[in-house]
Design a protein with these regions (language model features):
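Divalent metal-cofactor coordination and adjacent catalytic microenvironments
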Residues: 1-269
Length: 269
C-alpha cells in the first residue's frame, strides 16, 4: 500500500509562534489545520509548491504549432521525454517559458515538429522529471550524526535536532524526507516523500530543507491560524472586522488577502 506524500507549507513551530502557543496540548489539532490549509492552497491554485518526482502521461497534440504540448502543470526539470518513436534528445525540444522554470509547455524543433504515435495518440508521450512551482532549499545547519543505513528506518540522529522542525520537507542526497517528529536529536520521518526513492545516507551528510514561496507560506499561516481560532464559527458566510474581510468557503473562513494571493498564484493555462 502506497503511503501518501506529505507537503506542509509551514512548520508546526512556525504556526505556534504565530499564535503565541508554547504548550503541546493542541499540537494534533494544529497539524490537522496545517495539512488542510496546505491542501487547500494546492487545490485552489492547481499547483504543488514542493518538488515532486513523477512520471506523467500526455496525449500527443495534433495541429499545434511546432508540436506544442501544453502540460497543465509546472515542470522544473526533465529526466526524459519519450513518445512512440523512442526517447527525445535534449536538443530536439525547447521548454517554455524560456530561461527559467517552472515550464508549462514543450515545443519541438521546427525541423521535427510532430510527435510520433502508433495506434493512438492517447498517452503516447511520457515525461519523467521533477514537477512543482519551485525547488528552493536551505541548509538546515544540521548533518547526519551516524549513517542512515536502512531504507526503511523511520528515524535518524541529527547533529543538532533543534535545527529541524516538524512539517519540514528535508532533502538528504536525492531523497526527500517529511519530518513528523523531533525529540532531542532524534528525528522521525516519512521516507521517500514526493516520489523520491528511500536510500542509504552516510554519516555527516548535509540536511537541507525545502523552502516554499513566501506568499504560499503566508497564506497557509493565515488560513491555519484563522481556522484554529475560529473553528466554532462555521455557520457565518462573511464577516468584516475593520479592514479585515473574511469569506466562508464550505464553512471555513478564507481571508480576502489569501484569496487574492492564491488568485495571483493560479496559472492562466
Amino acid at each position: 500500500m502506497a503511503v501518501r506524500d506529505r507537503r506542509w507549507y509551514v512548520s508546526l513551530d512556525a504556526l505556534k509562534n504565530e499564535l503565541g502557543i508554547t504548550a503541546t496540548t493542541h499540537d494534533a489539532k494544529l497539524k490537522r489545520y496545517i495539512e488542510r490549509a496546505s491542501a487547500y492552497v494546492e487545490r485552489v491554485t492547481g499547483r504543488t509548491f514542493h518538488p515532486v518526482t513523477a512520471t506523467r502521461y500526455f496525449d500527443a497534440p495534433v495541429g499545434t504549432p511546432r508540436g506544442a504540448l501544453y502540460l497543465g502543470d509546472d515542470l522544473l526539470s526533465v529526466t526524459s521525454i519519450t513518445d512512440d518513436g523512442g526517447a527525445l534528445t535534449a536538443t530536439s525540444y525547447f521548454l517554455y517559458p524560456l530561461n527559467r522554470p517552472p515550464y508549462r509547455r514543450v515545443e519541438l524543433l521546427a525541423t521535427s515538429d510532430t510527435w510520433t504515435f502508433t495506434d493512438s495518440r492517447q498517452q503516447a508521450i511520457i515525461i519523467v522529471g521533477t514537477w512543482g512551482y519551485s525547488a528552493s532549499y536551505d541548509d538546515t545547519g544540521a548533518t547526519l550524526n551516524g549513517a542512515l543505513s536502512s531504507t526503511t528506518a523511520a528515524t535518524f540522529t541529527a547533529s543538532d535536532g533543534s535545527l529541524i522542525e516538524v512539517g519540514w520537507s528535508l532533502l538528504i542526497d536525492s531523497e526527500q524526507l517529511f519530518v513528523t517528529g523531533v525529540s532531542s536529536n532524534t528525528v522521525t520521518v516519512q521516507r521517500g516523500n514526493n516520489g523520491t526513492t528511500a536510500a542509504t545516507h552516510s554519516t555527516g551528510a548535509t540536511i537541507y530543507r525545502y523552502v516554499p514561496e513566501p506568499d504560499v507560506t503566508e497564506a497557509v499561516v493565515l488560513l491555519a491560524a484563522l481556522w484554529y481560532q475560529w473553528r466554532d464559527m462555521g455557520g457565518i458566510q462573511s464577516q468584516r472586522i475593520g479592514d479585515y474581510a473574511v469569506t466562508y468557503v464550505d464553512g471555513w473562513p478564507v481571508p480576502e488577502i489569501v484569496r487574492d494571493t492564491l488568485a495571483r498564484l493560479t496559472p492562466l493555462v
